[in-house]
Curated annotation (Swiss-Prot):
Residues 1-176 are annotated as: Endonuclease. Homooligomer; when bound to DNA. Interacts with host E2F4 and E2F5; these interactions promote the nuclear import of E2F4 and E2F5 and the G2/M block observed in host cells. Interacts with host transcription factor SP1; this interaction is important for NS1 transcriptional regulation of p21/WAF1. Interacts with host transcription factor SP3. The endonuclease active site can probably bind other divalent cations. A motif (RCR-2) lies at residues 81-83. Residues 302-457 form the SF3 helicase domain. This is Initiator protein NS1. The gene is NS1. GO terms for cellular component: host cell nucleus. Multifunctional protein essential for viral DNA replication, which cooperatively interacts with the viral DNA origin of replication and transactivates several promoters including the viral p6 promoter. Binds the origin of replication and performs an endonucleolytic nick within a conserved sequence in the viral genome, thereby initiating the rolling circle replication (RCR). Participates in the transcriptional regulation the viral p6 promoter that regulates all viral transcripts and the cellular CDN1A or IL6 promoters. GO terms for biological process: DNA replication; symbiont-mediated arrest of host cell cycle during G2/M transition; symbiont-mediated perturbation of host apoptosis; viral DNA genome replication. PROSITE patterns: PV_NS1_NUC, SF3_HELICASE_1.
Amino acid sequence: MELFRGVLQVSSNVLDCANDNWWCSLLDLDTSDWEPLTHTNRLMAIYLSSVASKLDFTGGPLAGCLYFFQVECNKFEEGYHIHVVTGGPGLNPRNLTVCVEGLFNNVLYHLVTENVKLKFLPGMTTKGKYFRDGEQFIENYLMKKIPLNVVWCVTNIDGYIDTCISATFRRGACHAKKPRITTAINDTSSDAGESSGTGAEVVPFNGKGTKASIKFQTMVNWLCENRVFTEDKWKLVDFNQYTLLSSSHSGSFQIQSALKLAIYKATNLVPTSTFLLHTDFEQVMCIKDNKIVKLLLCQNYDPLLVGQHVLKWIDKKCGKKNTLWFYGPPSTGKTNLAMAIAKSVPVYGMVNWNNENFPFNDVAGKSLVVWDEGIIKSTIVEAAKAILGGQPTRVDQKMRGSVAVPGVPVVITSNGDITFVVSGNTTTTVHAKALKERMVKLNFTVRCSPDMGLLTEADVQQWLTWCNAQSWDHYENWAINYTFDFPGINADALHPDLQTTPIVTDTSISSSGGESSEELSESSFFNLITPGAWNTETPRSSTPIPGTSSGESFVGSPVSSEVVAASWEEAFYTPLADQFRELLVGVDYVWDGVRGLPVCCVQHINNSGGGLGLCPHCINVGAWYNGWKFREFTPDLVRCSCHVGASNPFSVLTCKKCAYLSGLQSFVDYE
């Protein structure tokens, strides 16, 4: 039998209106195994017993009803509340409220001096359906309360008649065998979709389920297999199925529920790397034509080494090294590669710097976090370290409070140093060491060709599927001791499938501090693009550097132009310091008297420990020094690409780029 449940609130004002019939009632209450009833507690016990007596001899819809009434004191205010559990052949959701209110108010009418009425609040689900779990509610909630919390209780349900007002039984109810409600009516046919509300132990589901539930389960599995996690992707993959489901309100709700379950399954129950691998390995055999492979080779990285690390990193198997940092100047493929990886995972979130109060609003419940060109402020540095290190934490969300964020892989793309922490108008490096311990950094220094195009999910799947199928040992050798800087390419350990692909241009240097095979002359300083030489907010020249060879063009190849500027224009257009002041010995550089060259530090004098052949900082200092010396003694010889053939001197004098290139500022000051 279905038993409905609800609550009646009895305020203290109702008891103030009690008449003599209520106070002087001779109703016998058995309190032999119960706490003594005094004052208003006795009034409520009399009232509850009077309602039960009337219900036993009433007719209409309440005839033959089972009931369980329990009155309790309010915790935070004066007064009482009555738990009502009842059900019968004539009761249904339509007449339940009217019948219960009529029964209690008819009895109350003869016990008060004023016209006071009680209101019944039935228990309902969030969808507006009535709870029908009265049996479980009695066993798991009402009968587990003991006197002082419970004022009085009455019932006509077998098994509870003698025990409902037994303090001894209630105190041992959790160990005693619970009685069951036995009726001739089969109560297993409850309406679908209504909550049972049980508090008992969770029992694994062993049933076969209904046809609708099996169909819904099949739909969720289909979404995961076809990598459909958004409504737009669903429309593209199977528009007919989406249209049929959207035609009804219940179908639209199924779409949202199925997508949520598919996302949960993909982010928590299935390794993320499975979505980055191609199902057909035969389609990934021509790996040398892959755009990502060409990009990484151009940046002087081994595509196999990077790919194996990405597969391990995306599955959260790198420990504290939970973050990939793509660092370099614009147009080098950083964001292109990061977004291609992000679009290949089930669902990704982005750190939003437009809202400084809630930058991590989109991080919770994602497979990957993309951090594009951001800064770390002192107010969020601790949360940022937890997220970058893959540690569980809580972040604030707008209009939602704080939510838990488990370890999620993070990929960062930036032109500046992300390890600097900003606090007001100051910048500190106190947290730099802790942040670097959570990252693996890849330097992107070679600009990509304009016709490279966007990297796609197919490129990522082809690249990573090929990497997953290779058994190359040099990744494990590096993974034993993770370093902050990702190791550069090793020609001896390069996979045979990659040997025929160009590795790096003649004018580029190792992005990870690798060894150069040729001695660098002073004239070649102006053709270098070195790490740190591009840290500027001022835009670079739009004119590309002409190529040094006529070989086949690939991702990082420079392009030709009819208007050619000075060969060092792009390389030297950098703000390493104030470009109009003279360099200071001991501050900006150290002079190597043996070779007659500037170096970055005393340790690199006479090529000990580095020098021009190994240290990129020494190369930067040399290019800076020679460029300054060249501009000082040739003030008006070099011009930008727009004024190469200009005859009007005022056009050159007013051009900021010409002033930077040829030292015209010092020339004007002198004149």
